[in-house]
C-alpha cells in the first residue's frame, strides 16, 4: 500500500454531511464485524457487535484510538494503554475488504476478467472503486469518508512537470512518474473507459474521468494491500490489491511497531514491539527508500530516520564510466563486448540500477560481476567468454559489504568511484547546497512542503553516494 506521512485527510470523497466521520466509521466497523479496541467502540457509542471477526480472536484487541490527535499526519491510531509485543490491535474479516471480488459488481468483473487484464493488474479493483464511489447505497460509504480528499493527494504525479523535474532531478522519481502517467492513460483509454461506456447503468458520467482515474490509481498505490504469496505459490501471478479498512489508517515508519498478518478468514494487525500509552501505532509498507515513498505514497521520512533509504547507480552509468577510461576504438569495442556478455548473463540491463544502501549493496551479485567483467584483463575475459560464463564461480568473499569496499581491487574501486561521480552530476544541486538548506531551520521552514520532501530525498541519496566516494578513494 501507504514524517508528514499520509496526506492530510481533510475531507472524504463522499459527502457525509455534518456527521462525525470517525463515529460513523466505528459504527460501520461494528456492523461488519471489524474488531477494534473496546475503548474505540465506546467513544463512538453503541454496543459492540458479536460474530464476524470476533470468532477469530484468541484474546481481545489492545486498546487503541482512531484519532487525528497525537499522530504524525491525518488520521492514525494511538495506543490508549500500553501495548505489549504480540498483542492484537484489530482484526478485519475478509468480508469487510473492498476488492474486485467483494464489491457489488464482483460477478461482472469476474466474467470480464480476461478483457480487463492489464500491465498493472489493478483495473478490476479500480473499476470496483469507481462504481462504489458513486453508488448511493454502497456498503463502504462510511469507510470512504475517512479517505483523503482525492484532489489533494501529494504524489509527484500531481505536481506540475517542471516542478517535479526541478525538485527531483537525479532521484529517479521523474522517470518513474512519466512511465506511470503513460501506463495510466493507456489503461484508461483502452480498457477502463470502454468498459464503463458499455455499462452506463453502473458508471455515471461523473466517474468517467481520466482525472478521477489518476487519483484512484494514486490512492490504490498508497493505501491498498497485496497479500503475499505462500512459498509454494511463488510461480503464480501476484495477488490482486485490496483495500483494507482500519489497516490503511496506520501511518508508515521504517522502525514500525505493528504488522499485518493474513489468515484464511481475516487479517490481523499485531504489535511487533512494546507501544507505550499515548504513542502512535505504525505499520510498514516494506523496506522502502525515500524515493519510493514519495513516488508511491507522497511522503518521505526525514534524514536520517529512514534506515531503508538507498541510492541508485544506473547500470548504463557504470558502462559510461568504463568507456571514459578507454583510449582507443579497440578498447571501446571491448567494453561493449563485455557489456553484451553481462547482458547475456542477465546481470545488467539498459534500464536497470545498482542499489546501494547505508550498510549494504542490495544488488551485490550484479555489481560484483559487473565490476569483475569490466575490469578483468582482456585475455581473462576471452577465457571467461569462451567458457560461456561458466568458469570460475568463486565469489569475491565479503567484497561488497559497505565496510569491505576499501578492500576491493584498485581497478574496481576506480570504476565504482567514477560511476558515483557521474551519478552525482545528474542532480541539479550538490551535497553542500542541500546540507545548507537542511541545517538552517529558518530557511528550511520557509520551503514549501514539496521542496522539503524533495530535499530529504536528494540529501539521503547523496549522503549514501558520498559515503561510497570516501570508501573508494
UniProtKB/Swiss-Prot annotation:
Effect on the protein of changing residue 285 to A: Abolishes methyltransferase activity. Greatly decreases the stability of monomeric, homodimeric and homotrimeric structures
Processing after translation: Automethylated; Lys-39 and Lys-179 serve as the major automethylation sites.
PROSITE patterns found in the cross-reference section: SET
Keywords noted in UniProt: Methylation, Methyltransferase, Nucleus, S-adenosyl-L-methionine, Transferase
Ranges for domain SET: 60-286
Family annotation (PANTHER family): N-LYSINE METHYLTRANSFERASE SETD6, UNCHARACTERIZED PUTATIVE METHYLTRANSFERASE
Protein family membership: Belongs to the class V-like SAM-binding methyltransferase superfamily. Histone-lysine methyltransferase family. SETD6 subfamily.
Record protein name field: N-lysine methyltransferase SETD6
Taxonomy of the source species: Eukaryota, Metazoa, Chordata, Craniata, Vertebrata
Gene that this polypeptide is encoded by: SETD6
